Amino acid sequence: MRGIRFLLVGGIAAFALSTPALAQQYPSKPITVIVPFAAGGPTDVVARLVGERMGRALGQTLIVENIGGAGGTLGMTRAVQAAPDGYTIAIGNMGTQSAAPSLYPNLRYDPAKSFAQVGIVNYTPQAVVSKKALPTTNLKDFIAYVKSKGTGVSYGHAGVGSISHVAGLVFNAQFGLTPNLIPYRGTGPVLQDMVAGNIDYTVDQSLNVIPQIKAGTIKSYAVAAPERLSSIPDVPTTKEAGVDFIFSAWNAMVAPKDTPKDIVEKLVAALNTALDDPAVKARYAELGSSAPQGADRGPAGLQKLVDSEVARITPVIKAAGVKVE
């Protein structure tokens, strides 16, 4: 027993001594970044952009691994189960980190407690858009029109639990709208049907709808942001349109719970370096996105955002009775 006790205590001591050493050497090999959505989507685009710059700051390659399914929760569950050594991190979004607990009764992670928060990666405001044939020209008239039509108007979204689904629930609830909700498999088909005149409207990330707005194939009423976007400067903000509605999608970087603090701090520093990079800022502007600033950066800023978004979104989802079994 004495020998076993000695080995056990010695092993614990060795682990305790090795943890700081591992943190000092970190990273000594490539880092896997789990993106819980398909390649080419908004989260994937941002992950690759920021990951490349973070890799330069850290002196190692960040390798994106796309693990889609179950509204992004499959990939985030994989991240929770990874070793807390800093070599597997993930980029979730508003859906996986705020809406998921209300949508998935059997969710295998708690966004507020199951991760070591690294930081907010970007914000992308929602844009209110419709098919060209809708007989409205401004946001107030649009809301009044949709309200008057009830379920005779269709709302297209990218699937249950998607950003456009959640944003639509919040928007529709705030203004008393009761459209017929039509789920699609992704944003692309929604916009294709909108251009074809088969879907009346959606509230989606500006990143997704900027090409159609510029091409003039859909109507744009407003962006739900405090300021206009430089990529679509003619589209007013919701405030300018006389409507009180601010809503941004966001992406966030997390690591498995119990990742050493020193390693998290290195990831935070690398993320901030990436967000301050002029090339990243320029690309964000093209995408209609922006980086967090000041106190919104880092683990505390992300934790505050997750907590506030869960509080905002949960009542709306529960009232709508939406569940994913």
Task: Walk through the language-model features, giving the residues of each.
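Short beta-strand->loop
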Residues: 110-120, 178-182, 200-201, 210-246, ...
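An extracytoplasmic/periplasmic, membrane-proximal ligand-sensing/linker region
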Residues: 28-30, 261-325
